[in-house]
Amino acid sequence: MMKKLLLATLVGMVLILGACGNQDTAGKDKKEITVGFGVGTYEEQFRNGIVPILEKEGYKVDIKSFSQNMQVNPAMKEGSIDASIFQSTAYMEGINAEIKSDMTGIAYVPGAPQGIYSVNHTTLDDVKDGTTVAVPNDPVNQERAVRIMEELGWVKVKVDAGTTDFNLNSVESDKYDIKIKVLDPAQILVSLQDVDYGVVNGNYIANANRKITEALKIENTPLEHRIIVSINKANENTQWAKDLKAAYESKAFEDYINAQEKYDGFILPDAWKNN
C-alpha cells in the first residue's frame, strides 16, 4: 500500500514539474506578442518596419494603442502588453519607482529630439522679457525642455535639480524674464499660436507630417532621454525579446527608416554602426 502511495506521489510530482517546465518554455518561446504605444510616430515605425521582420520569423504581433502615454506602463505591469515603444530610460526609471514596476530597456529606436518651434516668430532673436514658452508637464520631458532653454541663456537651472522629479522650482531667470507655460506634451504643437515658443517632443512633429528640421533649436539628446524598447525585466532572456531587439538593430529596419523622408533629423541607434 505504501509503495503504491509513494509511486502515485512521485508520478504527481513529475507531472506538476513537467507542466511548470512546459509553461516556462512556452513563455520563453511564445510566438504571439502584444506591443503597446502611446501617442506619436513610433507605432508607424513598428507597424511598417518591424512587424514584417517578426512575421517572417513566425511571430503573430498585436499592436495596442493608448490615447495617453500614462496608460502604457500600468498595462505593462499587469501583463496585458509584452513590450512598449514610447519612452526614454529616464522616464521609465521614474515610472518604475512610482508604480513599483520592474521594466528594462532592450534596444534604442530611431527617436525624435525635442525642439523649439514657433508660429509667431521665425527666429530665437525675438526673445525678450515676458516671452512665453510652453513646456511639457511631465518631469522628465520638462527637464529636457528647460535644458534647451538653459543652453540658450534664457533660464538657469539649479545645480541640485533632479530629472524624474524635476519641477519649475528648479528654474531661475537668466538673461530674460521668461514666462513658462506648462502643457500636456501632445497639446504644445497645437497650442503654438497661444505662446511665443513651444518645446515640442519630436514624435509629435513627425506624426503631424512635419519635419524635425523646422525647429528653431534642436536638442542634443542625452542617451538617457533617447527612446527605447521597454519590457518587464523578467522577460529579458526570452527568445521573443531577443528577436524584437534584433529586429530593431537589423539592416532591414535601418534601410526602411533611411528610405522615409519623414524621419530626417531623427537620432539613429548606435547599434546600426555595426550593420
Task: Name each model feature, range by range.
Residues G40-D62:
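Short, polar/charged alpha-helical segment
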Residues G94-I106, V119-T122, D194, V199, ...:
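Ligand-binding "clamshell"
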Residues I106-W154, E254:
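A conserved helix-loop-strand patch within extracytoplasmic ligand-binding domains
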